Amino acid sequence: MENNKRGVVEAKGIKSHYFQTLANYVSNNLELLHNNPKQANSFAASVFGSTAPIDEKDLLDLLVPSDANADALAAGMDCCLLLGEKYRPHFDAAVQQLARLGRTHDVATVIDDEKKFTALSKKTKLKKTDEAKILQAFFKIHSTEDEEKFEAISELCQLDLDFDAYVFIKALTLENEENQELVETIKDNLVEAWNKSNPLLVKLLLEGVKEQDPVDKFTYLLLQPLTEATLSDAVNFIVEKYSAELPDEGDASLVVRSQLGCQFFFLVTRTLAHDQRELAKLVQTLIPRPVRLEVFPGLQRSVFKSSVFLGHHIIQIFMGCEFCSIQSIKNTMFSAKKPFQDWSFVGLAQDFECPWRRLAIAELLKKFSVSVVEKVFDNPVALIPQHESDNEALIELVTNALRFALWIVEFYETETNEKSIKELAFLDHSSKTLLIESFTKFLQGKDVKDQDHLKRIIDALEKSRTQETKSNLEYSREEIKTKMPSSSSAKAQVLHGLNTSAAAGLIVPSLSLLEIPVDEVDSTSHLTTSKDIGQGVFVKAQDTVTEKQKEAPLVAQQTAFHHEPQTATLVPPSPNEESMAAESISTDGWDSPTKSVVLPLDDMILEEEERDALKPDSVNSHRSEETTPVPEQLPQETSERVTSPPPGERSRTAWGDGDATPMILATPTNDYKVSGFGGAKLAKGFGTMGSTGGGFGGGGGGGSYGGRGGYGGGDRGGRGGGFGGGDRGGRGGYGGGDRGGRGGGYGGGDRGGYGQRGGYVAGGDRGGRGGYRGGGGNF
């Protein structure tokens, strides 16, 4: 038979020769060792800091396991000889076990013969192979006394066997104050080796196992690996708490029952992620009928099986994918090539035909997803206890799988629509490829109707994979330039002499409140000379209107309309309405008495009357005036200046003889109009802000339909202020309001004036008293 061979093996970053089985166990049970050492192998836990006594059976299971391969068994036999005479019987027993595997142990034939043992040791020292070096270390450790063993064991680090050296030190309890610094050096070597490949192992090495505080029974059950026994105990515990809450219909009880219901769905989702679908059925059967009627209302009880089969199918596709980043899960638990149950056979295809059953399936899939995303337990619980370190990645994978399952249900028969395809944007390219391959294999052998459904799913995935779907909130660089012109582009427009009211004089960003004064430059006409409009920008343009061109007469006559405001009437409620209001639980119509207060019907009527009483008559007048049609004005190029008739001959208007009825303030707008005495970018002054301010960049007072004007009375302002009284305002100021039609004096406003459409310096037209210095306006 062949002699045993020695060499360094690696298990997920852990290099070892003597403790190969231990290295494999640790790499596969990191979470268990870190969070629940009492449930782990006691010898492995003691290596990482557990103070619990070591069970000899646990140690032997790691040294000479019954199912080990020949190399691992031979390495464990070396350990039995190095750990002391008490393990010699186990070494002898393993010789026969190794022989059955077709191997012999080279030390077993010389262990009882000192001469042969020494001769083998000397012969080994002459060899330079890695295998010989490992055997040399074995002879040195075996031959040294206890006080010298630490140094002999430390030499294993030169062979890249730092893990074996650390385990020997722990197993033989060689660590003390004198060699503490040397032990820390060995740990540093391990940290450096594991830092990139296995960070959780580094955490376990540095922090040690958690000597768990006592936890409640329920949390203890949730931390155990999933079995039928632990699942049954957990379900029964939740049922007991749920049943105690059933008699109470208060809000607090409803919240508790909602949380407990999510705990049921968490256990169901855990079975699907664990690839133990049949245990999901156990969850439903263990729940008694009164509780089940609430947890699975309506059709959800009937379609629970279909929801479980669909969720399990898609989750397992994601779990077993070769692109799965959770390597430990992919390698140890799942396979992407497993067969799945036919959807028609399990009734899922029939449920797809009914929209109400599809709706119930969708609700259950949403509950599955919520149960793993939200914190449904008092203490943190991983979806798969053995893989707590990968819990976040695992939850993301499961929720994506459930989201795709929900897509299949919600977009049944509309899978290839544009909206349906856009909903698949949450899947990455590799996931779509995997799903296409899986469903392509799955549809083989199905009937025609099932094949049509699966082909629509595949077609939608292929279209989503090939076409670039862009989010509504994403724009290309060119689109951004088109939708949001920069300040530099606005400046360029000004420099080229653009005269539109939106662009003229605008050389600052659109969000800036900086005002640029423009002295008596009308934005509606062309500039004949260059103008400095601020910020070092000059506007230069050619006047396209010749001086000899005459203006056509303006013959439009505005017609006055009068509309009587309608008085609002309050219709008293009927007796039926009063009784319904009295019987209602709350004013908002919801069955939530703890969150609403009943408001008596009489109080509601009184409140409405008070609000109507506070409204001035002018408001009602304004409402009726808003319906007055405005005569169509002739184009500007046909207008001609005409002399307005004397005040006595002026026709009455809808406002009466000089009636200066105030109007409601209009909503301020962002009108970037720049003109001599007209609108400006931001109305500022002494009065109420109007829709457009007066000249000199600001007008204040005289906001639209009311307010006392400031230095440049606003358009249509009441009691227009100085230097440009408001249009349609009473008491116009030094210059009448805008829309004056080029009146005389300082700019007499139209319909403005002193008291009754007059004007201090340019009587407005249609006004009562004329201004002090004439210059009457149009009409």
UniProtKB/Swiss-Prot annotation:
Compositional bias per record (Polar residues), positions renumbered to this chain: 584-595
Organism this protein belongs to: Caenorhabditis remanei (Caenorhabditis vulgaris)
Keywords attached to this entry: Developmental protein, Differentiation, Endonuclease, Hydrolase, Lyase, Nuclease, Oogenesis, Repeat, RNA-binding
Compositional bias per record (Basic and acidic residues), positions renumbered to this chain: 612-626
Region ranges (Involved in dimerization): 203-464
Any single GO BP term: oogenesis
Single GO MF descriptor: RNA binding
Subcellular location: Cytoplasmic granule
Protein name: Guanyl-specific ribonuclease pgl-1
Function field: Guanyl-specific endoribonuclease which cleaves the phosphodiester bond in single-stranded RNA between the 3'-guanylic residue and the 5'-OH residue of adjacent nucleotide, resulting in the formation of a corresponding 2',3'-cyclic phosphate intermediate. Essential role in male and female postembryonic germline development; maternally provided protein maintains a population of proliferating germ cells and zygotic expression is required for correct oogenesis. Together with the P-granule component pgl-3, is involved in the formation of P-granules.
